[in-house]
Amino acid sequence: MIDTRLPLTDIHRHLDGNIRAQTILDLGRQFNLSLPAATLESLIPHVQVTANEPDLVSFLSKLDWGVKVLASLDACRRVAFENIEDAARNGLHYVELRFSPGYMAMTHNLPVEGVVEAVIEGVREGCKAFNVQARLIGIMSRTFGESACLQELEGLLAHRDHITAVDLAGDELGFPGSLFLSHFNRARDAGWHITVHAGEAAGPESIWQAIRELGAERIGHGVKAVEDRALMDFLAEQRIGIESCLTSNIQTSTVASLVQHPLKTFLEHGVLATLNTDDPAVQGVDIIHEYNVAAPQAGLSREQIRQAQINGLEIAFLTPSEKQALRELVAG
């Protein structure tokens, strides 16, 4: 279902949610860390979703082993590099990798700014090696509170020229966007784009807040937007993109089934909705699965899938000239 004449993008992809099981095993051994299993086969159930989780917080716990083995800055550089290698293997032309430097740093008390630098370096090396274009989105992990998010913001600002956008992710219900107004004021002052996880665990009001108070240009997941007709109209009229992640929303029990997923409704309503992975290694999926398996099961027609692919570049955090250059590159 992928149109090979168009750029293939993944603009909602967590770098720290895409740490290979083999890499977790390798780093665990390298740093003599205690892992829940000693072989790759027995480790996978601990680091990958094998059945739908009851909620988002339970799903997020599957990510923890990936960051628990990041005992050095070089380990952070390695997983960033491997993220680009994975993107190339999936046939992606352009990827936006988002990461929470505080989350990656916390287990082994790494310097947050150093983690940011290591990720930048790994991505740069990967793009050069595998001929993939990438941009970085810094995440503030709301779950850890306002002060921790401020630390993340400071670490990202130290390398502001290498960061394209900032995001707010984590426990949406427990830590609403209203707690982070000053953080986003500074992010906008830095000239960054804004995307926010909203309407995943909380309702449409969380999406409104992300747009009106935090300045969101795009919304991560946003599945609850369908509950508010005025919001749907606003998203379409203002060209505020939705970063849809089909399989992820089922695995987190955010949506009961693919048939009930709102992506088809978004596209029918003229919302610039897209197809993305979210946390590929944890989910056990890739972008090809989302296009060829998940999207048809969600009721999307071939033309709607193509439109979602077009939208992926349309709402990417690239300049118009960069988008056109990518179109021409793929068209040959």
Curated annotation (Swiss-Prot):
The lineage of its organism: Bacteria, Pseudomonadati, Pseudomonadota, Gammaproteobacteria, Enterobacterales. The keyword Thylakoid does not apply. The active site is at E200 (proton donor). The record marks H221 as: Important for catalytic activity. It catalyses: adenosine + H2O + H(+) = inosine + NH4(+); 2'-deoxyadenosine + H2O + H(+) = 2'-deoxyinosine + NH4(+). One of its GO terms (molecular function) is adenosine deaminase activity. Disulfide bonds: none annotated. The keyword Hydrolase applies. GO terms for cellular component: cytosol. This is Adenosine deaminase. Binds 1 zinc ion per subunit.
